[in-house]
């Protein structure tokens, strides 16, 4: 009898927050991503509409994966976010606003490269929105590269 090979799966969370209620107005905001199983939490300030920041958060996470590909090359990557719009627009035939198309196009290139899945999760379960206290105290044996994430390809 042959053994069934199961590919490891890793859950990653992305988030974007702005101060103003108007999600279409360009403003200062916070992008973040978390990989709880690895004890990774990344947060950075950025500028854009709330919807742009959601894409920028996804792109920052994908850039992190690209920079640290050896750590993720044999993993199935499940990206979870609290944005139904982002999940919808990243589906194959979705319509996207003109101002978001540049970000979406780049994210779709990454999607082909890394074969990640993108799903919705309620804000209360989005680990990228929470603080460091919610992540396990792991001694990380991997040498991750965070430095080049801010070199924005978007």
Feature map (PLM): residue ranges:
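RNase H-like nuclease fold core
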Residues: 2-52, 64
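Compositionally biased, intrinsically disordered/low-complexity regions enriched for serine, proline
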Residues: 5, 33, 133-134, 150
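RNase H catalytic domain
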Residues: 19-23, 59-134
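Short, low-complexity, polar/charged sequence segments that are solvent-exposed and flexible
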Residues: 32, 97-100, 137-140
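Short C-terminal domain-edge/linker segments immediately following a structured domain
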Residues: 42-47, 74, 108-113, 148-152
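Short amphipathic alpha-helical face segments that pack within enzyme cores
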Residues: 52, 56-60
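Terminal low-complexity, poorly structured segments
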Residues: 54, 131-134, 138
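Charged phosphate-binding loop/patch that engages nucleotide di/tri-phosphates or the phosphate backbone
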Residues: 135-154
């Amino acid at each position: 009898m042959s053994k069934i090979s199961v590919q490891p799966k890793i859950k990653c969370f992305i988030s974007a927050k702005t101060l103003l209620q108007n999600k279409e107005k360009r403003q200062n905001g916070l992008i973040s991503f978390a990989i709880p199983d690895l004890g990774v939490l990344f947060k950075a300030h950025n500028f854009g509409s709330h919807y742009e920041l959601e894409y920028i958060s996804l792109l920052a996470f994908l850039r992190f994966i690209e920079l640290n590909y050896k750590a993720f090359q044999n993993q199935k990557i499940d990206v979870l976010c609290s944005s139904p719009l982002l999940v919808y627009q990243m589906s194959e035939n979705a319509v996207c606003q003109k101002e978001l198309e540049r970000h979406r196009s780049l994210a779709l290139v990454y999607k082909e490269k890394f074969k990640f899945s993108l799903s919705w999760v309620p804000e209360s379960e989005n680990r990228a929105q929470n603080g460091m206290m919610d992540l396990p105290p792991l001694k990380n044996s991997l040498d991750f590269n965070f430095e080049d994430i801010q070199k924005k390809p978007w």
